């Protein structure tokens, strides 16, 4: 199906609820949308994919009536809002009452200091009766599992909790079309699941959903998928149709869904399976071919697949024992509450963010902190970076207590803090000036500052962008520019708060490559992440729950079968390859070990199938035309 046909198709007997025809929109000299034509049917769920800067958020703003294009025609919920180069403002006002939008960043949408008041803000502006508003607020807070926080201050909530409040506020206006601009980018596993359950429920009540996302698996439940590239529709169709163009999808800076990637890996290894992006279909096919397999001499090898997440750890595991160096970070019985004033007086209802945390971070290690939103991960990072000090207990970084005001100044150049969405800290006129700010404030000479700026920009792949405005870079490039400013200070410890959140797959891959290189060169990394696949790459994983560290160990230890129920109860998941392996085992397959990557899982499956006589699945020849 062609991109144009798929993007514009709608039932002939039914007028589309959203219609864009040859829409063009530019920001100055930058063309954000370039001749986009798109029809969305009533009750349809449409997913919009694309790399950072492809035009997704601009398209979302046009669909929800926030932006008028420069050219083309736009019809929203039956209102012709733009045609013949002019906007009809009365039509826009009528249409906006039936349109809802959830922004990418919840801070841009929250307007009050109490959760229930924020959810009520939209219905109040529609002039609804108070009793109706009260009903809507209760219903939508319950829908997003935030009813217990009705009286809370949104500023005191975690990022994921704030996002759920904005979704409730949009739904409280009962829109006919709801536009979601990456609503789950800052959520934990439980939060993402709850949001996607809400999205699925909307289908049953006839609400049309236009969903912008960087998570390929979220797109699998859509009726149609549209992929944008430089403001144009590059691919469109059902999820299976779009993702079957694997090479083209990768060329657009995206990635295949997990099932598509795994089935391709299996075909590359000669296993005769059909390519699919349907995880249940792949599971069923593999279960038929592997169930009841007897234990084989290869089983022991399979059990070790994926349990070592890095070559460095594998080398260290076989090296002779040696005395452990002093940890880069040591936290002892750390307690912290946001309810304390500067004079350290406790407010009676102060929430306890950290409650007796103990954690050692080995020098040169990569440590991942995981936990549901509100578990204390970001708070612990701030304390490690000496941005706050513990109420009780002690944190030492490189042997220096963060509570020692006189000595902790030495940490300013040694600890780099990469905040959530670090691009928000950009401020200078040029990229070079922004990156130079930190080393300049360390008192370095102009020549040394220039050298550090050049090396940092080379490291993050922004060579040649010295004189560009950081605000004209793509979202992914802005993230790298902010990281370069931190790296230019030469830190031995990087603490990163969800560094890949909001990045497209290519941006995530580039950032992971940079961080892996820094870690291999000796930089200690402490990273907060909601992606279990990212946590699986670390040397150590620490799980926080209720302000406490409740599990620590290697990824294989933390994600082991004995912890599965405990992790589930805490609202966490496990890496997708490991979850799929366990689902296969539940379906009757022999144990596949603990594969933490799709490559390790594919190896384990092929090994198992290859040792079972008479399996329905066969090993295809390398020349088999079905191999991709």
Named regions from a protein language model:
Residues 64, 385:
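Helix-to-loop junction immediately C-terminal to a conserved catalytic motif
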Residues 131-149, 447-465:
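Conserved ABC ATPase "signature" region
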Residues 165, 170-171, 486-487:
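ABC ATPase C-loop
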């Amino acid at each position: 199906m062609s991109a144009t046909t798929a993007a514009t198709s709608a039932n002939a007997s039914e007028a589309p609820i959203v219609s864009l025809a040859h829409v063009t929109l530019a920001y100055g000299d930058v063309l954000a949308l370039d001749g986009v034509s798109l029809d969305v049917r009533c009750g349809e769920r449409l997913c919009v994919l694309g790399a950072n800067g492809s035009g997704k958020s601009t398209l979302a703003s046009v669909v929800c009536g926030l932006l008028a294009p420069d050219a083309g025609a736009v019809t929203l919920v039956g209102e012709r809002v733009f045609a013949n180069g002019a906007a009809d403002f009365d039509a826009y006002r009528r249409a906006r009452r039936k349109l809802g939008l959830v922004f990418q960043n919840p801070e841009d949408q929250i307007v009050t200091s109490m959760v229930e008041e924020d959810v009520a803000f939209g219905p109040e502006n529609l002039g609804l009766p108070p009793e109706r508003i009260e009903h809507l607020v209760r219903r939508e807070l319950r829908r997003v599992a935030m009813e217990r926080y009705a009286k809370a201050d949104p500023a005191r909530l975690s990022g994921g909790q704030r996002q759920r409040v904005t979704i409730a506020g949009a739904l409280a206006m009962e829109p006919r079309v709801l536009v979601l601009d990456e609503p789950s980018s800052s959520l934990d596993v439980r939060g993402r699941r709850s949001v996607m359950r809400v999205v699925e429920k909307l289908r049953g009540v006839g609400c049309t959903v236009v969903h912008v996302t960087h998570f390929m698996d979220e797109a699998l439940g859509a009726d149609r998928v549209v992929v944008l590239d430089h403001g144009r529709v590059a691919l469109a169709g059902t999820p299976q149709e779009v993702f079957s163009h694997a090479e083209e999808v990768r060329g657009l800076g995206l990635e295949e869904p997990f099932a598509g990637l795994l089935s391709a890996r299996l075909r590359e290894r000669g296993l005769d399976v059909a390519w699919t992006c349907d995880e249940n279909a792949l599971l069923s096919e593999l279960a038929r071919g592997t169930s009841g397999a007897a234990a084989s001499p290869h089983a022991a090898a399979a059990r070790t697949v994926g349990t070592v997440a890095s070559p460095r750890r594998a080398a260290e595991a076989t090296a002779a024992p040696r005395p452990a160096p002093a940890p880069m970070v040591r936290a002892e019985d750390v307690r912290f509450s946001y309810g304390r004033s500067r004079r350290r007086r406790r407010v009676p209802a102060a929430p306890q963010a950290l409650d007796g945390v103990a954690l050692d971070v080995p020098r040169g290690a990569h440590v991942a902190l995981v936990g549901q939103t509100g578990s204390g991960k970001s708070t612990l990072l701030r304390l490690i970076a000496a941005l706050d000090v513990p109420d009780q207990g002690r944190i030492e970084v490189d042997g220096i207590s963060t509570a020692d005001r006189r000595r902790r100044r030495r940490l300013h150049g040694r600890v780099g803090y990469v905040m959530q969405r670090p691009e928000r800290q950009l401020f200078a006129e040029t990229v070079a000036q922004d990156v130079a700010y930190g080393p300049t404030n360390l008192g370095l000479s102009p020549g040394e500052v220039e050298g550090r700026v050049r090396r940092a920009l080379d490291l993050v792949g922004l060579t040649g962008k010295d004189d560009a405005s950081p605000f004209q870079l793509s979202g992914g490039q802005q993230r790298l520019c902010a990281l370069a400013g931190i790296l230019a200070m030469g830190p031995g410890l990087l603490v990163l708060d969800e560094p890949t959140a909001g990045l497209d797959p290519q941006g995530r891959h580039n950032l992971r490559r940079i961080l892996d290189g820094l870690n291999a060169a000796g930089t200690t990394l402490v990273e907060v992440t909601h992606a279990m696949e990212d946590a699986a790459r670390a040397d150590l994983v620490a799980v926080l729950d209720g302000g406490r560290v409740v599990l620590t160990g290697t990824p294989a230890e933390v994600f082991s079968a004995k912890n599965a129920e405990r992790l589930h109860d805490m609202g966490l998941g496990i890496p997708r390859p490991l979850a799929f392996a366990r689902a296969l085992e539940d379906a009757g397959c022999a144990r596949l070990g603990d594969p933490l990557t799709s490559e390790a899982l594919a190896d384990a499956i092929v090994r198992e199938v290859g040792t079972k006589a008479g399996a329905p699945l066969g090993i295809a020849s390398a020349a088999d035309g079905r191999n991709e």
